[in-house]
C-alpha cells in the first residue's frame, strides 16, 4: 500500500531522513513513531507529496507517487493534527464544498451518512467556529472520508483531545479499518498506537530503527520478563529462597505483591507456582507483565538501538 525505498531528505547540511525503507501492507493499521526531530513529519510530508525527497522512491498502491500524483491523491484521505477549517461556514456547507472538489455523487446522502456516523448530524447547521476541538477533529475525519479513500494517513489524530474524544476517534479508526481501509498513523500517544496497530515503525535520528509487531518487538528487546505474584504465608525466609532461584534476576516487594524479574528464555510461571506450593505458600494471583510499546520505544530511542529483521539488536 505504501513503500519507501532508500528515501532521503537533506536540508543544506542537515539530513532529516536517511535511507528510509518502510512497508505498509494493505488492510493494516501501521503506527509510525519517533521522538521529536526523528524525521516523522518530514517523511509524512514526502509521502503526501508536499515535500520532494532528495533521493529514493515512494510507492503508493504500487505506483511511483510522482507518476500518477493526482490519481493517487484521489484514493487517499488525510487527517492532520490541526484542522484548518473555514470557521465562518457551517459543517454542512464546508463538507458540501469538498464534495464538489472531489466530485462526490449523491453528496447530500453522503454528508448526512457521515455526520450521523460521528454523531454531529444535529449540529450540521452550526458554524465550525463554534465547534469544540474534538468536534472539529471529527469533521476532519468526515472530510477525509468523503472521497471513499482506500488509504487513510493520520498525523497525530488524537492530539489535544480529552479521553472521550480519544475513544471516539479510536473507535472511528477501527471501524474504518474493519471496512477495509489501510491506516498509516503517527501519534505521540503510544498507548493508543499499541491498542489498535497491527505493526509499528519507529524512527530515530532520521533512520528507521524498528518495524515489527508488538509481540516480535518484545521478543527482540526483552532479556527478562516481569511476573507479579500475590501470595500469603510468605515469610522473609521464603523471600530469600525466591531470590536464590536460578532463573530469578531480582525480586521487589510492591504494595503487598512481589514483582519477580526472570529470564526471558522460557515461561517460568509454572516453576513459580510449584515453588510457592512447595514452601507452603498460598498463591492468590500470578500475572505476567508484558513490555508495553512505551517501554519498547524508550528502550530503542534512549539506548540508540536498531533492530534488524534477523532479530539482531545493534547499539
Residue map of PLM features:
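Non-catalytic surface loops within mature trypsin-like serine protease
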Residues: 26, 122, 231-233, 264-266, ...
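A generic structural signal for secondary-structure junctions
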Residues: 77, 103, 119, 140, ...
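Residues at or immediately flanking beta-strands
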Residues: 57, 127, 226, 252, ...
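C-terminal coupling/interaction segments
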Residues: 264-315
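Short beta->alpha junction loops/turns
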Residues: 65, 104, 232-234, 265, ...
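ABC transporter nucleotide-binding domain
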Residues: 170-263
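ABC transporter nucleotide-binding domains
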Residues: 2-4, 9-204, 208-210
Amino acid at each position: 500500500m505504501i513503500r519507501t525505498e532508500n528515501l532521503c531528505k537533506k536540508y543544506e547540511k542537515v539530513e532529516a531522513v536517511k535511507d528510509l525503507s518502510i512497508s505498509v501492507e494493505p488492510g493494516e493499521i501501521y503506527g509510525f513513531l519517533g521522538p521529536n526531530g526523528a524525521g516523522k513529519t518530514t517523511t509524512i510530508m514526502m509521502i503526501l507529496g508536499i515535500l520532494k525527497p532528495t533521493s529514493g522512491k515512494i510507492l503508493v498502491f504500487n505506483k511511483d507517487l510522482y507518476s500518477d500524483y493526482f490519481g493517487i491523491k484521489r484514493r487517499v484521505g488525510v487527517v492532520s493534527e490541526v484542522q484548518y477549517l473555514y470557521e465562518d461556514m457551517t459543517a454542512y456547507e464546508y463538507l458540501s464544498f469538498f464534495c464538489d472538489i472531489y466530485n462526490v455523487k449523491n453528496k447530500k446522502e453522503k454528508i448526512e451518512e457521515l455526520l450521523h456516523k460521528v454523531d454531529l448530524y444535529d449540529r450540521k447547521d452550526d458554524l465550525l467556529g463554534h465547534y469544540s476541538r474534538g468536534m472539529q477533529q471529527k469533521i476532519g475525519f468526515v472530510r477525509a472520508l468523503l472521497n471513499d479513500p482506500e488509504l487513510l494517513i493520520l498525523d497525530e489524530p488524537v492530539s489535544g483531545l480529552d479521553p472521550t474524544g480519544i475513544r471516539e476517534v479510536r473507535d472511528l479508526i477501527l471501524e474504518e479499518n474493519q471496512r477495509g481501509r489501510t491506516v498509516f498513523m503517527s501519534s505521540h500517544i503510544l498507548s493508543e498506537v499499541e491498542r489498535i496497530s497491527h505493526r509499528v515503525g519507529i524512527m530515530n535520528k532520521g533512520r528507521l530503527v524498528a518495524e515489527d509487531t508488538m509481540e516480535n518487538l518484545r521478543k527482540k528487546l526483552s532479556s527478562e520478563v516481569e511476573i507479579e505474584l500475590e501470595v500469603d504465608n510468605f515469610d522473609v525466609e521464603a523471600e530469600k529462597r525466591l531470590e536464590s532461584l536460578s532463573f530469578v534476576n531480582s525480586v521487589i516487594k510492591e504494595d503487598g505483591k512481589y514483582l519477580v524479574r526472570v529470564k526471558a528464555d522460557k515461561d517460568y510461571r509454572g516453576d513459580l507456582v510449584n515453588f510457592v506450593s512447595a514452601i507452603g505458600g498460598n498463591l492468590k494471583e500470578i500475572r505476567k507483565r508484558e513490555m508495553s510499546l512505551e517501554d519498547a520505544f524508550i528502550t530503542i530511542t534512549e539506548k540508540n538501538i536498531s533492530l534488524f529483521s534477523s532479530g539482531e539488536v545493534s547499539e
